[in-house]
């Protein structure tokens, strides 16, 4: 029962969540999505694969292959793809995210770029980013970048407080 688990400590909540998610994930191997990308064009290739595949099921295990590389994906290639893909999403040349430097708070965080695309294609990229972020969480993949607290609370639809604003604008 969700009400009962909400009263538990964090460790028990995490165990419950992990157990719950693993029972929800489809583990079929015959029709799992296959992603084929070039390392040099990982963001565009990945976006194109997701946008051209109808009904992409993010609950299924994905198999990833890098073009011109002989490697069997038993998990390592998939995790490397995630790492490289998020690095590409967060690269300033992608115009999606920017680093906010809060030396007074002792950390750098990632927030939506001021020059992020607002057209249909840009919105689709952010939509895909959200799905991949959810997939990364489901698969227990740790991001090397810290998302901004203001952004996280917006994503999970939590109320933004005045204290949260310091993570967006120190002034």
Per-segment meaning from a language model:
Residues 1-171:
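Long, Ser/Thr/Pro/Gly-rich and/or acidic low-complexity regions in intracellular
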């Amino acid at each position: 029962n969700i009400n009962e688990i909400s009263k538990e400590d964090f460790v028990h909540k995490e165990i419950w969540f992990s157990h719950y998610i693993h029972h929800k994930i489809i583990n079929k191997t015959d029709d799992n999505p296959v992603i084929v990308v070039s390392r040099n064009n990982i963001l565009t290739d990945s976006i194109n694969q997701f946008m051209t595949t109808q009904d992409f099921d993010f609950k299924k295990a994905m198999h990833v292959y890098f073009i011109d590389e002989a490697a069997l994906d038993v998990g390592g290639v998939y995790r490397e793809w995630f790492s490289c893909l998020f690095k590409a999403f967060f690269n300033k040349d992608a115009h999606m995210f920017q680093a906010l430097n809060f030396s007074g708070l002792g950390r750098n965080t990632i927030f939506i770029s001021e020059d992020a695309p607002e057209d249909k294609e840009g919105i689709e990229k952010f939509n895909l980013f959200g799905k991949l972020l959810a997939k990364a969480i489901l698969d227990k993949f740790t991001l090397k970048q810290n998302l901004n607290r203001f952004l996280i609370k917006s994503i999970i639809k939590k109320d933004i407080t005045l204290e949260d604003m310091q993570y967006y604008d120190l002034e």
